[in-house]
Amino acid sequence: MNILIYKWKVFNQADVKSAFEYFGHSVDMYEEKPLSSDSITGIKEHDYVLLADVFREYDVIFSLNYFPHVSDICEQTGRKYVAWTVDSPLISLYHQSVFNSCNNIFIFDKFFYYELKQLGVKNIYYLPLAVNTDRLSSQLDSQTREEKERFSADISFVGSMYHKNSYDDIKDKLPP
């Protein structure tokens, strides 16, 4: 299968690309250059004609998080759009384009999944987040014994809680 990853500033796109390639798919990454962008509102003007031309070369368009304009262009060009959320709640999922038949949307937040399912969104699925364990294992193998002892734990939280310094607000309430 010929897959295009719609690239943006997110941390785990390389892991997804590696997984697709591991299963024998041809994968390219494409980073859109908006025609214009408003720094105050964040609204971007997209070149729909250019994107449609790019998308026509692929069987599937994939993105981490959901982009309404990508869905609309996939609907128009007859391409499948697969989106896997990495943020929650993701406001873009409240756009009318979630009802496009081209979509296959995967959401890691089960409560948000249920909410959208109850709103009648079809082709929406629950899928937890994932990681390339081979990549992480190779990083761990390069650590010294002292680093491994210093950073070892029974449970680790990796990621962010969407609030600046929220750990500082809860650290005194955590068990030792």
State the predicted function of each range.
Residues N2-Q13, L119-P176:
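Nucleotide-sugar donor-binding catalytic core of glycosyltransferases
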Residues Y6-L119, D134-Q143:
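Extended catalytic core of nucleotide-activated donor transferases of GT-like folds
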